[in-house]
Swiss-Prot record:
Belongs to the orthohepadnavirus major surface antigen family. Residues 2-207 are annotated as: Pre-S. Residues 2-148 are annotated as: Pre-S1. Residues 149-207 are annotated as: Pre-S2. The gene is S. It is found in: Virion membrane. Its main location: virion. Residues 2-214, 308-379, 430-431 are virion surface. Residues 115-147 are annotated as: Disordered. This is Large envelope protein. The keyword Cytoplasm does not apply. The large envelope protein is synthesized with the pre-S region at the cytosolic side of the endoplasmic reticulum and, hence will be within the virion after budding. Therefore the pre-S region is not N-glycosylated. Later a post-translational translocation of N-terminal pre-S and TM1 domains occur in about 50% of proteins at the virion surface. These molecules change their topology by an unknown mechanism, resulting in exposure of pre-S region at virion surface. Residues 2-286, 236-286, 401-406 are intravirion. Pfam families: vMSA.
Length: 431
């Protein structure tokens, strides 16, 4: 059975609500059946309604013809005085007890799913029956801190499942505010069936492409770039010092920095302030130094690519030649589609004369052949270069001796180049 309902008809206000028990007893016969006096309960009976909408439709159809100012047309066959809720000590002849029983319907809250209504605890007796003014209705309870009630989600979900079993209809019901037969019950705090994962305020929102490892790699790359930039600045300053020292064999003098417009303090020519006359020359020297360092890096890159065979250059004087059909001239000398490729000449006979490109040092061989064709005296250096290449141990000892002899003079220049040399060596080995 559902909760019982008590319907009170009063000229000032008509209300419907759910008390724990709504059974009332009347014992007297009416004297005037055409007039319904205030304060008298009209006993009637209804089949147990399924929901609030069915109860509203039954009551509205029954009492829509009533003139509430004169109470004419009210379907009453008895005029009964108000008596106590307590049943009489013994039954009477014309005793009647009527109850309204409905099942609770869903509560519709904007933005939230339909949640089964929980049972409302019985209300305490008010001062309606004592002749006082009606007590103003209590507004519905609101859950102002829903995040505090989500700790024990199992209990709320179990209550939600139990409520779904008792629900007899799935229609959405909307509370009609102002309707005297509409009851607003306190809302029971529950949790929705769709739970979003909790999120902490202030957590960084990472992009799917930006993983922690890639972020660390980016930071490490920025540190390497900053380190290399500081080393390049140091290299430029040391080379500028060396360049300036070439003009002053006895030592670099101090720059007075005196001119007609500005008066500056004494300083070195390698650190002139913007107000000094030597400032523009200092930056011109450093610009040339930066260009030379960039050229050195490009030369190293070309040497590395040429050593790997990634610069296909046809030699001037091929050592081996092959004659193939011109339609096969684009194929490599070893009948492969990978380097080294072959260079072909197309005669009129329809055949091509091809010779292969070296798999390594193709650009070096081309430049050496070009230099020998213009400068014949370079042929005298060929035995020396072959000897240095064949006797590598002697060449290393010679290099060590040169560094030992000129080391103190180059000590202020070589240290900034050491990180660059190490970087070039690693690239040479692992690429």
């Amino acid at each position: 059975m559902g909760n019982n309902i008590k319907v009170t008809f009063n000229p000032d206000k008509i209300a419907a609500w759910w008390p724990a028990v709504g059974t009332y007893y009347t014992t007297t016969y009416p004297q005037n059946q055409s007039v319904f006096q205030p304060g008298i309960y009209q006993t009637t009976s209804l089949i147990n309604p399924k929901n609030q909408q069915e109860l509203d439709s039954v009551l509205i159809n029954r009492y829509k013809q009533i003139d509430w100012n004169t109470w004419q047309g009210f379907p009453v066959d008895q005029k009964l005085p108000l008596v106590s809720r307590d049943p009489p000590p013994k039954p009477y002849i014309n005793q009647s007890a009527q109850t309204f029983e409905i099942k609770p319907g869903p509560i519709i809250v904007p933005g939230i799913r339909d949640i089964p209504r929980g049972l409302v605890p019985p209300q305490t007796p008010t001062n309606r029956d004592q002749g006082r003014k009606p007590t103003p209705p209590t507004p519905p309870l609101r859950d102002t801190h829903p995040h505090l009630t989500m700790k024990n989600q199992t209990f709320h979900l179990q209550g939600f499942v139990d409520g779904l079993r008792d629900l007899t209809t799935t229609e959405r019901q909307h509370n009609a505010y102002g309707d005297p037969f509409t009851t607003l019950s306190p809302a029971v705090p529950t949790v929705s069936t769709i739970l979003s994962p909790p999120s902490t305020t202030g957590d960084p929102a990472l992009s799917p492409e930006m993983s922690p490892s890639s972020l660390l790699g980016l930071l490490a790359g920025l540190q390497v770039v900053y380190f290399l930039w500081t080393k390049i600045l140091t290299i430029a300053q040391n080379l500028d010092w060396w360049w300036t020292s070439l003009s002053f064999p006895g030592g670099i003098p101090e720059c007075t920095g005196q001119n007609s417009q500005f008066q500056t303090c004494k300083h070195l020519p390698t650190s002139c302030p913007p107000t000094c006359n030597g400032f523009r020359w200092m930056y011109l020297r450093r610009f040339i130094i930066y260009l030379l360092v960039l050229l050195l890096c490009l030369i190293f890159l070309l040497v590395l690519l040429d050593w790997k065979g990634l610069i296909p250059v046809c030699p001037l004087q091929p050592t081996t030649e092959t004659t193939v059909n011109c339609r096969q001239c684009t194929i490599s000398a070893q009948d492969m589609y990978t380097p080294p490729y072959c260079c072909c000449l197309k005669p009129t006979a329809g055949n091509c004369t091809c010779w292969p490109i070296p798999s390594s040092w193709a650009l070096g061989n081309y430049l050496w052949e070009w230099a020998l064709a213009r400068f014949s005296w370079l042929n005298l250096l060929v035995p020396l270069l072959q000897w240095l290449g064949g006797i590598s141990l002697i060449a290393w000892f010679l290099l060590i001796w040169m560094i030992w002899f000129w080391g103190p003079a180059l000590l202020s220049i070589l240290p900034p180049f050491i990180p660059i040399f190490v970087l070039f060596f690693l690239i040479w080995v692992y690429i």
